[in-house]
Amino acid sequence: MRALIQRVKHASVSVDGHDVGAIEHGVLAYIGLGHDDNLQSAQRMVDKILTYRIFENDDDPAKYGKLDKNVQQVDGGLLLVSQFTLMAKTDKGRRPDFGGAMAPDAAQDLFAQLIAYAKTQHVDVATGQFGADMQVLSVNDGPLNFLLEVP
């Protein structure tokens, strides 16, 4: 499982011109699911995203400006967007190979479980719409982007 996380000032997802999810200050997370992923790896990924320290600590003068706080500590939102293209193999040729991505039906079920778990761990969780042609708008804060992986 892979996640591309971005610290954002705000982010939103729309489908067919209708907003389906939005957050203010927080983390936009694109989630890619692979063949071997399961509920346990999904829970590990959510835990990692929620505790990954990508926000500055402006409260402690000794840590001022250092990335020392996570999204929960800054009361930020979490926007989860399914993104099978994160599982692409790009090391050969000029066309991505999506063979490593989980099959759509299984991925939809696992992504729904990932969302449900995230909502038990964090107050402000929004999502895109699985399998839809989504338009994602965000204002990247920093910019700060990190590629996270869990087995």
From Swiss-Prot:
Motif (Gly-cisPro motif, important for rejection of L-amino acids): 142-143
Subunit structure of this chain's protein: Homodimer.
Reaction(s) this enzyme catalyzes, per UniProt: glycyl-tRNA(Ala) + H2O = tRNA(Ala) + glycine + H(+); a D-aminoacyl-tRNA + H2O = a tRNA + a D-alpha-amino acid + H(+)
Locations listed in the record: Cytoplasm
Entry annotated with the keyword Cytoplasm: yes
Enzyme class, UniProt record, top EC level: hydrolase
UniProt-listed SUPFAM superfamilies: DTD-like (SSF69500)
Domain-level remarks: A Gly-cisPro motif from one monomer fits into the active site of the other monomer to allow specific chiral rejection of L-amino acids.
Physiological role: An aminoacyl-tRNA editing enzyme that deacylates mischarged D-aminoacyl-tRNAs. Also deacylates mischarged glycyl-tRNA(Ala), protecting cells against glycine mischarging by AlaRS. Acts via tRNA-based rather than protein-based catalysis; rejects L-amino acids rather than detecting D-amino acids in the active site. By recycling D-aminoacyl-tRNA to D-amino acids and free tRNA molecules, this enzyme counteracts the toxicity associated with the formation of D-aminoacyl-tRNA entities in vivo and helps enforce protein L-homochirality.
HAMAP family per record: Deacylase_Dtd
Protein known as: D-aminoacyl-tRNA deacylase
